[in-house]
Amino acid sequence: MTDIEIYRKRLERIEELLLELSEYSKKGAVIIVEGKRDILSMKRLGIDGNFELATRHSLFNFSERIAKLGCEVIILTDWDRRGDILATKLSEYFGNFGIKPELQIRNKLRLITQKEIKDVESLYTYVSKLRSKTGVSFDQEDNI
């Protein structure tokens, strides 16, 4: 498999995950991220939705408030040590409130990008780089 084929496959898998994330968002799910730049990256990738910053509150109170909304919860923290700890704690707290948060999108993004990037805010730049290397323009893929 050539480098371009590898990049194309990686881009395809990321685009599928972004489409899945977009679908969750359209259904009213709350997407939990760590910072404002994460939100900006997601919006630049075509994901509009209800974003919440997990790092601005007591995690217990934050989880309780989100759980009371009664909607699906997607944890999209960074895939560094801090993001892993935050995802684990949030998942535990949400579990205490009877909510099973979606973690698979985060985990799959982590696997696909593990040696390249470690955070959500870099995702837009990474996808742009993959699109450039594979010759896929944003116009061709902006159906998210």
Swiss-Prot record:
Residues the record lists as binding Mg(2+) 1: 34, 78
Binding positions (Mg(2+) 2): 78, 80
Matches recorded under InterPro entries: TOPRIM_dom, TOPRIM_RNase_M5-like, UPF0292
Keyword tags: Magnesium, Metal-binding
Cofactor requirements of the protein: Mg(2+)
UniProt xrefs under PROSITE patterns: TOPRIM
Coiled coil regions, renumbered to chain: none
SUPFAM superfamilies membership: Toprim domain
Source species, domain of life: Archaea
GO molecular function terms attached to this record: metal ion binding
Cofactor note: Binds two Mg(2+) per subunit.
Key word Metal-binding present: yes
Pfam families: Toprim
Domain Toprim: 28-109
Protein family: Belongs to the UPF0292 family.
UniProt-listed NCBIfam families: PRK04017.1-2 (NF003091)
Protein name: UPF0292 protein MA_4098
Lineage: Archaea, Methanobacteriati, Methanobacteriota, Stenosarchaea group, Methanomicrobia
